Amino acid sequence: MFNFFAAAPKGFEYALAKELETLGAENVRESVAGVYFSASLAQGYQITLWTRLASRIVLILFTGECQSAEQLYNAAYTIDWPSHFSNRSTFSIDFHGTGGFINNSQFGALKIKDAVVDRFRDDDLSRPDVVKGHPDMRIDAHYGRGKITIGINFSGAALHQRGYRGNTGEAPLKENLAANMLYRSGWADNPVTLLDPFCGSGTVLIEAALMACDIAPGLMRERFGFEHWRRHDQALWQQVIEEAKARASLGKTRCQLKFYGSDIDSRVVALAKRNANSAGVFDFIDFKVANALNLEPPVAEGMVLTNPPYGERLGNVTSLLQLYFQLGEKFKQSYGGWKLGLLCSDMELVSSLKLKADKQMKMYNGALECAFNLYTLHATSTRRDIPVDTTGQGGEIAAPFANRLKKNLKQLEKWAKREGIDSYRLYDADIPEYNVAVDRYLDYVVVQEYAAPSAIPEAVTKRRLTDVLLALPRALGIDPDKIVLKTRERQKGTNQYQKLDGEKLELVTTEYGCSFKLNLTDYLDTGLFLDHRLTRKLVGEKAKNRDVLNLFAYTGSASVHAGKGGAKSVTTVDMSNTYLNWAKDNFMLNGLIGRQYQFEQADCLQWIRDCERQFDLIFIDPPTFSNSKRMEDSFDVQRDHVDLLASLKKLLRPGGEIVFSNNKRKFKMDMEALAAAGLKAVNIDDKVLPMDYARNPQIHNCWVVTHG
């Protein structure tokens, strides 16, 4: 008997142990990311050829304590390497694990390499060559918890590489993961008609057909690791191969099952057909190009087993949520009596199915942790176009939110047209349970999620946000691809809600005759603060024949209004070169070209101290708080506003005005200190609060400051 280790991804251990027992393994013991077992040489060959789950099979030659580099070397040296492979064979070492005296796997591999080479030399043999590419012999070592296990990679290249895929690059779904889905779903024990509506290159269906036809997954492989092992029994191996071929031939004649696969992409369907043909199961699988949402079940009962798109495989999160929701509706409407097994890495997407799982399991697709959920599908008469409420109270998904949104849209759409604007706020946490802001930018909608109170469970906030995104397209009559989601807190884990496929989404919006460039995806803000719309307009109305200064200018939108309003000159100052370039683009959009328009990159507070010019109109919208590394001092608008305005006094000509705005809630102007500085201020909040922000009057405050 020989001792082996079958390595596999995490989450495979239970199914792999059962498979190994079925294949005749003895002393089967589950471990992390693999299973230990004992087997005869014939059984070892059989398992290597037939395992559908293992990534590699290692023939163990040594296991023992290892607390130092010397012990590691000695452990490797005790193995009689010349009895296992020739000095004319090339070899490599795959070392797994770190800790203790082993800081990195390369150090462990070098120690074992030294021991192997020395063992050959001490046996009066020339040393074998080490190669990285395709060695004749792979030595496998694993270190953990003070123990070292050294062996020979019995199987060779990764076993999930069956040989039917060809050189098509990295697959979204590895073959052994597809096999594990088949095992854990119960399909392998009770084969039924199988459908994959997102079949991609056909992996799930091909693996299922190989099982149904009793075809060993290793039959298509050209090489195995044991072929250069000196104790390899070629006659015995050939016998195992011939038996497998006979079983495959018989299995294909007996298989009565039919498999169905579809994908919306004709190119991957063509690839799936080629792969199925290479695997010898083309005749058992019906592939076609189709949209999963329009696909009807081919028979009355069966199983859907699939890995739908998620994350970067499709793009916009709202489109994904809608896809999963509509998929759940399709399953409920058309697939009553079927079973469903679904693999996905994003639980928000899974929850959008609105299906109750019978069982939930964890699997890994490479390094990506995924949920594998099993469902029993029951027929319903739910209308496809009305999302189902998750509150248990009936009606639409997020019905209060959807109704409020429709009401706001009806009021604001006509108003915006009269005002000559096409970007405005539709919803601002009007209903506390749906704690988001919804802004319309032409045909697009940006959703900003506010951080929820700590008392509300994260699962609740995630569900509500998901429901908001599901309700939006229908409530506003827009395509899901037109919705962009932003969050006001740091992204965690596998959350994909940041960009649309990593591509810029730029638009041009108009506002009271001015045009502005927007970027809806690359930054937390879009380039235009909608709540300052009337403040910008006011700056434009006050700018005629005046020298205007815009500080903390962001993308220069107030400067554009000043230029369009007939300013004699406009000076735009901001610390960010990115935003200054954006401001220049906005000036170009509006035909504002000339030396009278100046752009200066600087710490605004320092710039004020250094400036020797004077202006007739100054617009300043400082941050509520800043401690940027590029600024010499920290800034707090409540603490420092008087000093700030006093420093601007020397820049303000007699008869000039400062339009001072900030977004600090409960801000209090220190009128006494301001008067002592020779200035006076008049609050104009009621004049510059736009209608679309009337629900939130504390969004910002605004003052006109003049010489006292």
From Swiss-Prot:
Its EC number is 2.1.1.173, 2.1.1.264. Its main location: cytoplasm. The keyword S-adenosyl-L-methionine applies. It is found in: Cytoplasm. GO terms for cellular component: cytoplasm. Keywords: Cytoplasm, Methyltransferase, RNA-binding, rRNA processing, S-adenosyl-L-methionine, Transferase. Specifically methylates the guanine in position 2445 (m2G2445) and the guanine in position 2069 (m7G2069) of 23S rRNA. This is Ribosomal RNA large subunit methyltransferase K/L. It comes from Shewanella amazonensis (strain ATCC BAA-1098 / SB2B). The gene is rlmL.
